[in-house]
Amino acid sequence: MAPADFPASLPLCVCLLLASGLAQAGRLLVVPMDGSHWFTMQTVVEKLLHKGHEVVVVVPEVSWQLTKPLNFVVKTYAVSHTQEDLNREFKIFIDAQWKSQQEGGILPLLDSPAKGFFELLFSHCRSLFNDKKLVEYLKQTSFDAVFLDPFDVCGLTVAKYFSLPSVVFSRGIFCHYLEDAAQCPSPPSYIPRMLLKFTDTMTFKERTRNLLAYMGERAFCHKFFKSAADIASEVLQTPVTMTDLFSPVSIWLLRTDFVLEFPRPVMPNVIYIGGINCHQGKPLSKEFEAYVNASGEHGIVVFSLGSMVSEIPEKKAMEIAEALGRIPQTVLWRYTGTRPSNLAKNTILVKWLPQNDLLGHPKTRAFITHSGSHGIYEGICNGVPMVMMPLFGDQMDNAKRMETRGAGVTLNVLEMTADDLENALKTVINNKSYKENIMRLSSLHKDRPIEPLDLAVFWVEYVMRHKGAPHLRPAAHDLTWYQYHSLDVIGFLLAIVLTVVFIVFKCCAYGCRKCFGGKGRVKKSHKSKTH
């Protein structure tokens, strides 16, 4: 018998609530991208799993991060390359960045020696669909949606093959496919193209280059993705373009926001979730707490070029080590390469460091970063001014945006000297404006109605519940290029105007002939008679 203050109906209510929660749980298919792309995507997947959803992650058997023990169902498929092949191709890609930095937008990638790395990634999709047992399993499982990283295109192909609504999770989209597939207006007059390192306030010369890059992307980007599109066409048994693959996307979750990004128009199905990787700082381990405490009044500098850069050319590493030895701060440098012979006593090499936790410590004075989106947002969230050494991809643009906002200094990692790095560090540490600017950005970023992680989870669940989001799809998808720009209407109106002008002209000409042409003939006739 229940106590007097315990309603007999309460257990029933609890059961109904639990049942309703389970009834709303769905099945989600996840097609991720390896490397740092997976780190943040994994947090979204884990929260969805925690909320009761059934999650299946499809990954290649050869990868860096994807085959590590996970809390959800993982389905692997065999690939045609080994771990050594993957490491070798990626090393070629990284080595190329240490020889010459990416300039001129996306077009130089077409002939880059590092293109083999991308071709290897694109080949994963053929391997996935060659696994007939896995394909049959996916076909028999009633998924509600696909959660995907579009970098290697395979997730888009999977969504189209199984006719499932999809949610894209990415920092940004190469080429013009975001504006074409999501129909986001992207005027080249003030929206800089990716990899050009321009701001939204461009000179005439920059606007000219920006327009040429915009036109070049439309002319040549399909070549970069040719093998991916060919594989998709082979799988789907019909010719498809990259736009065909991107267009059905229900929701675009982009890891940026208007604290980092320049203001621009977006469509209602494009959701900004910048800072999703930022978390509340945890207490430091005894090892790192000891490093921080030993730094004294000068504090520490955190240095990391990301999880994908394991080694730096020896000469460049020694230049960096020399510069770090000239500042009074203790430097915690995440580095797994060969130890520079001139490493100073104030510089501590570690194979791993709790980056977000260190950046959140009050004794952190500066952050040396490669400007990847994860590091940039951790710097923003924790209010730490940055010295940025971008290497490839969106890192160039991220660095330019932070520099424009007065929150950091950008260095060309290939051309910089020890003096350049020393001066940059002293500038962001000693010039109070950098700290003030990054704190202002941090305040703006945190002033939001909902956390980015919760927002991302909401929209994934939204697509799962409603089997897509067709009501957010703009009608621009159904227009031809000349209808979109109203060229047919302009032509029609122009034809009317020209017709009216022509008629008026003819009427005037006729009137003139009637009024003046007859008199002229009469006078002429009169003169001839007098002779």
Curated annotation (Swiss-Prot):
InterPro entries: UDP-glycosyltransferase (IPR050271), UDP_glucos_trans (IPR002213), UDP_glycos_trans_CS (IPR035595). Residues 1-25 form the signal peptide. It is found in: Endoplasmic reticulum membrane. Its main location: endoplasmic reticulum. It is an enzyme of class 2 (transferase). The chain crosses the membrane at residues 489-509. GO terms for biological process: estrogen metabolic process. Glycans are attached at N293, N431. Keywords: Endoplasmic reticulum, Glycoprotein, Glycosyltransferase, Lipid metabolism, Membrane, Signal, Transferase, Transmembrane, Transmembrane helix. It comes from the Eukaryota. It holds the Pfam family UDPGT. It catalyses: glucuronate acceptor + UDP-alpha-D-glucuronate = acceptor beta-D-glucuronoside + UDP + H(+); 17alpha-estradiol + UDP-alpha-D-glucuronate = 17alpha-estradiol 3-O-(beta-D-glucuronate) + UDP + H(+); prunetin + UDP-alpha-D-glucuronate = prunetin-5-O-beta-D-glucuronide + UDP; 5-epi-5-F2t-IsoP + UDP-alpha-D-glucuronate = 5-epi-5-F2t-IsoP-glucuronide + UDP + H(+). GO terms for cellular component: endoplasmic reticulum membrane. It is a single-pass membrane protein. Its EC number is 2.4.1.17. Widely expressed with highest levels detected in colon and kidney. One of its GO terms (molecular function) is glucuronosyltransferase activity. UDP-glucuronosyltransferase (UGT) that catalyzes phase II biotransformation reactions in which lipophilic substrates are conjugated with glucuronic acid to increase the metabolite's water solubility, thereby facilitating excretion into either the urine or bile. Essential for the elimination and detoxification of drugs, xenobiotics and endogenous compounds. Catalyzes the glucuronidation of endogenous estrogen hormone epiestradiol. Involved in the glucuronidation of F2-isoprostane (5-epi-5-F2t-IsoP). Involved in the glucuronidation of the phytochemical ferulic acid at the carboxylic acid group. Homodimer. Homooligomer. Interacts with UGT1A1, UGT1A3, UGT1A4, UGT1A6, UGT1A8, UGT1A9 and UGT1A10 to form heterodimers. Belongs to the UDP-glycosyltransferase family. This is UDP-glucuronosyltransferase 1A7. It comes from Mus musculus.
